[in-house]
């Protein structure tokens, strides 16, 4: 490992639609091969689906919840108000996304520590920046593993599942916490 000084923190510019630095970092996490415009379309599309679903759940418990992926579903989605134009939908989508991220963020993780020929898994608390980074990474990773047809739907459903306390990203967080709890006896090796 290089023994140089720590790399300086780079400033992340907020995303153009929501003016949120958190969302800009999430778009960067979704991005593959430098295709930022594709990543923006995926994230904004997913937040659009999330806003519609939350509006339908809180508002009228009607027959159309945006589940149908066909053309009729697309027409119905647009009639409710797009996040690009509707300020309330935008705020609702961002709030739901932040709630999902908060629920996925881990508090502790285990790190390997070698002591006297044995390797121990030592539980350590995580800094806020790393918590957010892990939560973003897990949301994208487990959205990719889902079975929905498009990445927009996969990401939207993973965010909605995270808000409700289920889904792959939440399971990963619980596994990390369980591992830390199991190795609590080695907490005195913390450095």
Curated annotation (Swiss-Prot):
GO molecular function, one term: tRNA binding
Entries under Gene3D superfamilies matching the protein: Ribosomal protein S7 domain (1.10.455.10)
Region annotation Disordered: where it falls in the sequence: 56-80
UniProt superkingdom: Bacteria
GO cellular component: small ribosomal subunit
PROSITE patterns cross-referenced by the UniProt entry: RIBOSOMAL_S7
Subunit and partners: Part of the 30S ribosomal subunit. Contacts proteins S9 and S11.
UniProt similarity note: Belongs to the universal ribosomal protein uS7 family.
The protein's name: Small ribosomal subunit protein uS7
Species the sequence originates in: Coxiella burnetii (strain Dugway 5J108-111)
């Amino acid at each position: 490992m290089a023994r140089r000084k720590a790399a300086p923190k780079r400033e992340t510019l907020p995303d153009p639609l929501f003016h949120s630095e958190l969302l800009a970092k999430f778009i960067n996490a979704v991005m593959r091969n430098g295709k930022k415009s594709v990543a923006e379309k995926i994230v904004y599309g997913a937040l659009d689906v999330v806003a519609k679903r939350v509006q339908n759940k809180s508002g009228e418990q009607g027959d159309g919840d945006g589940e149908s992926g066909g053309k009729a579903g697309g027409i119905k989605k647009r009639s409710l108000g797009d996040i690009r134009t509707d300020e309330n939908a935008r705020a609702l989508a961002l709030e739901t996304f932040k709630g999902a991220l908060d629920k996925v963020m881990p508090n502790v993780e285990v790190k390997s520590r070698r002591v006297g020929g044995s390797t121990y898994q030592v539980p350590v608390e995580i800094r806020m920046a790393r918590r957010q980074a892990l939560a973003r990474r897990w949301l994208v990773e487990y959205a990719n593993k889902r079975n929905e047809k498009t990445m927009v739907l996969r990401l939207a459903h993973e965010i909605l599942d995270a808000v409700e306390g289920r889904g792959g990203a939440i399971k990963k967080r619980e596994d990390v916490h369980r591992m830390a709890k199991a190795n609590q006896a080695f907490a005195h090796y913390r450095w």
